[in-house]
């Protein structure tokens, strides 16, 4: 087992391209995965991902940091939050999200299960 490891998101282990989105995944070993989510203006989870996964809201847990753009997130409990550059965030399962404005949203995510399965199930 390696005690030090690095991967570059510009050379990902896996790339997925759902509508208006690109997800680059890196596998750091020991069941640790991370994702770079690049989301285009006009992207909305309930329009672009919901048809693929078949749930009413996103059922993934998100732990990440925004490096560019803005994302609005609403939860089925009635709460909402907007994240922007420099914001660390968590979104519990049961949310919808969309890009705010005309800038691309880029977030790096560190929940291994979400990084492995986002836009797949």
Question: What is each of the regions a protein language model found here?
Answer:
Residues 44-45, 69-74, 97:
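Short beta-strand segments in beta-sandwich/barrel cores
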Residues 1-38, 46:
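A short, N-terminal "cap"/entry segment at the start of jelly-roll beta-barrel domains
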Residues 75-94:
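Short acidic-glycine-tyrosine-enriched beta hairpin
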